[in-house]
UniProtKB/Swiss-Prot annotation:
Pfam families: Mitofilin. Residues 248-317 form a coiled coil. Residues 1-28 form a transit peptide. The chain crosses the membrane at residues 69-91. One of its GO terms (biological process) is cristae formation. This is MICOS complex subunit MIC60. Signal peptide: none annotated.
Length: 578
């Protein structure tokens, strides 16, 4: 099918630009500066060859034309790329986002929403919707009446074009007016005119462009169209040559070609309509048969699925019904068993209540003093229990006191040198065993500290207060000499300290404010004489230097005795309040 449309005819002074544009077939491709022979020379009678592309002759390279549509497309494309890139950067940069919010370009909110929240699934869904709309679009071919109307309009425009060309041709061939002679110059004489050189005037004539076919469709165009194009080109050349004799024959040839083209177009349209109607009928019958076949297949599949699902649902419903019946049976049987059990329990309670009432009635009648006797027996039982607990506690206390007395006699009693030493740990273990039954926490804690102190001690290893006093008196000369030693003393210092220590006078009594060695010795001796071992040990522990080093063993023995006495006092006091 060939679709042809004539847009417009533009006449500008002596230049005719006839543009007959086809959607896919005919275009002008001859530049405006094409030069043809001058008007006085007739054009050659040889046929004009229409080339498939480029200028006439095909020897010169065609200059690429400026495309306004391409320029608009490229500008819109790059502007869209820059705009979209700016919005994408705005989602990553706060400064660009602030700039976008201040300027508020068009559709920026929708585009930002698409960039931030859009996904491939949304694009696929929109593409499917677009395809669905395109597939549902009802495209209709032009009818025969519209084609006839378009053909008639094409013929009328062709005739108008020819008449306008003839009219313009008559006005363009007129002589140019002479130039006026300036008033200031006089007319030249014949002799002067003969002496002037001969001037050659070159006249430039603008020619009409020829009609050419596109390169891709030149081979597939019908011969009638080619003959029509050739007739138009001959007319254009004759117009450029200024010959008036061949215009009538060319007009007749053009009219015949246009009539042939119109008749051929009518035949083609009628054949196209017939072929289209036949193919539509065939397609309709095939589509109806395929729809019927598909409907039968779908009906059969649906019936098969319906029967299959029905069987499965009946099977599931039957199994579920059996399970519910079995569960209901079990529930009913269990409820019956529970009801029977409850009845038995109620009957048993009622029977017990009846028996109890009878017994209480009999007791109130014959055994009225039984409650008083029971209360007195309970009081007697409580008294005997308390008495027994007191006896046990007293016995426990007596055992603890006996063990503690034996331990005190061994530790604090005076032991002779002829007496054989005995270990104290068995007595401590006996005390722990006896006091364990009392379950007193304080006694247990005291025994935990006392057992490590006396685990390796005997009756001779624990020093008494007189023994500690004797050892202190033996230690006094060494303390005096050590107090007189200078710092970093040598042999001479030791000898001089021993010598001068003999000259010191002993101090008797207690001197609370004295800090010299004699005052300390006097306070320790007086404290030991009064039995204040803790005060004496504290005084000895406050010594400094070599004196403290010499008295270290004595201090340890004194502290051990003090710890033993303190722990034994705690056990004795706690055992008395059991």
């Amino acid at each position: 099918m060939i679709r042809t449309s004539v847009r417009r005819v533009v006449v500008n002074s002596n230049k005719f630009d006839v543009r007959s544009i086809s959607n896919s077939s005919i275009r002008f491709n001859v530049p405006n500066n094409q030069r043809t022979p001058p008007p006085a020379v007739r054009p050659p009678t040889s046929p004009i060859i229409v080339t498939e592309g480029g200028p006439k002759g095909g020897s010169q390279k065609q200059k690429k034309k400026f495309s306004f549509a391409g320029f608009l497309f490229k500008t819109a494309f790059w502007a869209s790329v820059v705009y979209g890139g700016t919005l994408f950067v705005a989602t990553k940069n706060d400064k660009v986002m602030d700039f976008i919010m201040d300027k508020q370009p068009p559709y920026y909110e929708e585009l930002l929403n698409v960039i931030e929240h859009g996904s491939i699934e949304d694009l696929k869904r929109q593409l499917r919707d677009t395809q669905h709309k395109i597939s549902n679009f009802d495209f209709k071919l032009p009818s025969k009446a519209k084609i006839d109307e378009f053909t008639h309009e094409l013929e009328s425009r062709g005739e108008n074009l020819i008449e306008e060309t003839k009219r313009k041709l008559g006005t363009s061939t007129g002589a140019k007016p002479r130039q006026a002679i300036p008033e200031g110059n006089s007319a030249p004489t014949p002799a002067e005119q003969l002496q002037k050189p001969v001037e050659t005037i070159h006249k430039t004539v603008d020619h009409l462009p020829l009609i050419q076919l596109d390169k891709g469709i030149a081979s597939s165009v019908d011969s009638s169209i080619k003959s029509t194009i050739k007739s138009f080109n001959d007319l254009i050349l004759s117009i450029d040559a200024g010959s008036q004799s061949g215009n009538e024959s060319l007009m007749r040839e053009i009219t015949e070609n246009v009539s042939k083209l119109s008749s051929k177009l009518n035949k083609l349209t009628s054949s196209f309509d017939e072929e289209l109607s036949s193919k539509l009928k065939i397609s309709q019958s095939e589509l109806l048969s395929s729809y019927t076949k598909k409907e039968l297949e779908l009906t059969e599949n649906l019936l098969h699925q319906f029967h299959h699902e029905k069987a499965q649902m009946e099977k599931k419903l039957g199994s579920r019904l059996d399970q519910e019946i079995e569960a209901t049976k079990q529930t009913i049987s269990q409820a019956a068993v529970n009801a029977v059990s409850m009845m038995r329990v109620e009957q048993t309670k009622n029977f017990e209540k009846l028996i109890k009432g009878k017994i209480d009635q009999e007791r109130d009648g014959r055994l009225a003093n039984l409650d008083k006797l029971n209360s007195r027996i309970t009081e007697l039982e409580n008294f005997s229990t308390s008495l027994e607990s007191q006896l046990v506690a007293n016995h426990q206390k007596s055992l603890i006191q006996q063990s503690l007395t034996k331990l005190k006699s061994l530790l604090l009693g005076a032991s002779s040198e002829q007496e054989k030493p005995r270990l104290i740990s068995p007595y401590v273990d006996n005390l722990a065993k006896v006091s364990h039954e009392s379950k007193d926490e304080l006694i247990a804690l005291a025994l935990q500290d006392l057992q490590p102190l006396l685990s390796r001690e005997s009756t001779q290893s624990i020093l008494s207060t007189p023994q500690l006093l004797t050892r202190w008196e033996q230690l006094v000369p060494e303390l005096r000499s050590a107090s007189l030693l200078p710092p970093n003393a040598g042999l001479l210092g030791h000898l001089s300290s021993m010598l001068f220590s003999k000259l010191l006078f002993p101090v008797k009594g207690a001197k609370p404010d004295g800090k010299d060695i004699e005052s300390v010795i006097g306070r320790v001796e007086s404290s030991l004489a009064r039995g204040e071992l803790d005060v004496a040990v504290e005084e000895a522990a406050n010594l400094k230097g070599w004196s403290r080093k010499l008295a270290d063993d004595w201090v340890k023995e004194g502290r051990k005795k003090l710890e033993i006495e303190f722990l034994m006092k705690i056990i004795d006091a706690e055992s008395k309040i059991l």
